[in-house]
Amino acid sequence: MDPNSNSSSETLRQEKQGFLDKALQRVKGIALRRNNSNKDHTTDDTTGSIRTPTSLQRQNSDRQSNMTSVFTDDISTIDDNSILFSEPPQKQSMMMSICVGVFVAVGGFLFGYDTGLINSITSMNYVKSHVAPNHDSFTAQQMSILVSFLSLGTFFGALTAPFISDSYGRKPTIIFSTIFIFSIGNSLQVGAGGITLLIVGRVISGIGIGAISAVVPLYQAEATHKSLRGAIISTYQWAITWGLLVSSAVSQGTHARNDASSYRIPIGLQYVWSSFLAIGMFFLPESPRYYVLKDKLDEAAKSLSFLRGVPVHDSGLLEELVEIKATYDYEASFGSSNFIDCFISSKSRPKQTLRMFTGIALQAFQQFSGINFIFYYGVNFFNKTGVSNSYLVSFITYAVNVVFNVPGLFFVEFFGRRKVLVVGGVIMTIANFIVAIVGCSLKTVAAAKVMIAFICLFIAAFSATWGGVVWVISAELYPLGVRSKCTAICAAANWLVNFICALITPYIVDTGSHTSSLGAKIFFIWGSLNAMGVIVVYLTVYETKGLTLEEIDELYIKSSTGVVSPKFNKDIRERALKFQYDPLQRLEDGKNTFVAKRNNFDDETPRNDFRNTISGEIDHSPNQKEVHSIPERVDIPTSTEILESPNKSSGMTVPVSPSLQDVPIPQTTEPAEIRTKYVDLGNGLGLNTYNRGPPSLSSDSSEDYTEDEIGGPSSQGDQSNRSTMNDINDYMARLIHSTSTASNTTDKFSGNQSTLRYHTASSHSDTTEEDSNLMDLGNGLALNAYNRGPPSILMNSSDEEANGGETSDNLNTAQDLAGMKERMAQFAQSYIDKRGGLEPETQSNILSTSLSVMADTNEHNNEILHSSEENATNQPVNENNDLK
């Protein structure tokens, strides 16, 4: 990988961190807050006081019952970040995003209907005899102007769209363009009795359609979840195909009429489609990213809540909002943007020149593919091939266009943008060349049927690939600060090339004076242009499948060319989401037990997989270790569930609810590289749960770097830090797999004699721990999450409260715990050294965070633990347990 790209990526992350912190503070103002009564039960972390199980129980109960959803700008009422991200995100519903995205695609239907309409109207006998100036037929020049001037209007409409959409919103722009601009143009066309008024009406309608074509894909991209973005934007092209088909069907039913209704009925029906879209938009939300653009975070949160189907205080929704806000603020810090900035690369817009070229080139090659030649002039062309019913053939081509757009909705997310465009372009090239060869060689009815068959193949390939994917890429490729302008430029490029093709095609194909009379030879031109488009796609298009709109910037920084972009796309997705894992995976390296892993890659996986647990019977006999049955995966018990259902199997009388609050991150002289989310595991360990990070001492340890990026600031990327962290994990694995030991102790609560064993799932004892819920923390660690169990050095470590602290803190394990903490202290010191020396107070904060007992243990346990550590300090650590 290019080291410069790695350096730029790292610099970008560092610079964005400050904006992430500021965005987090802003989002606090719209998050859940605790009532004053709840504050009375929280721990004063500054005094170091320890909460008892009773106070902890009361605090969690109050938190569950007293937090309410409010909007407020007074961020002082929210004490810490734990309110924002302490609870697992709820399962998001994709239904509303799908409905919104599909509905606004009606804008594409207007485009397709008007495009197909002119193809049929100019061939109607009544129109040729009453509207055409010579009352016989339209000349090549008249056809050229009549067809192309719609595209001229759309060109200007697309360029004006960003000014309206950035000033007043995406939603008002769509409403204004349909109910006013488009309807005015449509009225002129309905009332036209001659070619002049018909042309003027098409230009005005074109302005409305152009604005819609620039804003609808933009709205879809900004409102839709990333897992559906490609498919939803592709519905815009699908709606275009339906418009073409319906216009052909309507014209087929009216073309035989011998009065003005033959063309006025098809044109007048456009009032229905435009009114349907305009009225429906009143009930849809504004784009959340537009609200961020206008710094209206409360409205942005409400919009996201509507689109994602979760409450406004959901942690997953708030994290998404923080990311959107921080990315936009980072871009805005470089100043306002204009149309010129869309073509200039900068720190806030990496490879912007290439991105702009990619969007414009794709739109141009889409129009140069030859598709609009068939839809604009198909009826006339089929007439000249000897086909008896050209209207029927034209209708068939429209039907093929509709049908094959459906698989394209799935191809774009399943195969990715690059593969779909390359494969589709190759098929289109071959089909065009075959049509040209057959059309030039033979003049028979059989040859005409072969031509029609391969034209249908070309349309099928176009519809499933280039038709929708080009709009997807044009809508998602650009930073938020210039996104509306760039999308408008791409749409304008589409219409400009469309205008050129519509203007010159009659002169190229038709026979007569001042024409080239190419006929079927024009398909050689389309085939050659398709081949050029494939080359451009291969070299310039970056694979953006599965990335958020904000992650696309990182892709362009990391990847030097589009050819290698799929690798970096995979790296980014794996870092953020993790690829698909089996629900249960057995690690054979001797460092872990059977553990559950979340399927983070599949967005359709229910969100209750956020913390998976093992469910089913596991046979741990010496000769056979396998999972017998996994009926289902369930959530870790909630605070309320555990409070109501104490651990009866262990005789637990004082329940301890799980603490899912964030541990404050020590402030360093450098900003954290990425957001972190800490959970108190007890015994001096804090787990960074963000992106499945390992137990973390550094605030940026959740950052996953690829193997090519060794040298980054995280514990997973830095070679020396990674080695040290591996030592810690190896040590814990050694503890997990050490020989079972037992000590007979007396339960201080019940007075019963109990045997405490050193065992794991791989050395199961007779005392089955039915209530242990193991989670895979990665890197050889398994967490027993039931009742806040620490990393499962002991299978029954969650019973420490009920057993008077004798489980994990007895003298038999003191040396082991001391050795583990010694290694963590070494790692903390290496982290301090790496920072280049910090203030003494900062060093103390880091070391205390890594070594101190977390706040959720009781005073009794605290005393025993300190006593154990003192004993361990006076005894040398067993060399056999210290992994080299």
Swiss-Prot record:
GO terms for biological process: carbohydrate transport; D-glucose transmembrane transport; fructose transmembrane transport; glucose mediated signaling pathway; mannose transmembrane transport; negative regulation of meiotic nuclear division. Residues 857-869 have a biased composition (Basic and acidic residues). Its main location: membrane. InterPro entries: MFS_dom, MFS_sugar_transport-like, MFS_Sugar_Transporters, MFS_trans_sf, Sugar/inositol_transpt, Sugar_transporter_CS. GO terms for molecular function: carbohydrate:proton symporter activity; D-glucose binding. It comes from the Eukaryota. Residues 701-710 have a biased composition (Acidic residues). Residues 30-67, 642-671, 686-725, 739-772, 791-812, 857-884 are annotated as: Disordered. Phosphorylated in the C-terminal tail on Yck consensus sites in a yeast casein kinases YCK1 and YCK2 (Yck)-dependent manner. This phosphorylation is required for interaction with HXT corepressors MTH1 and STD1 and ultimately HXT expression. This is Low glucose sensor SNF3. It comes from Saccharomyces cerevisiae (strain ATCC 204508 / S288c). The gene is SNF3.
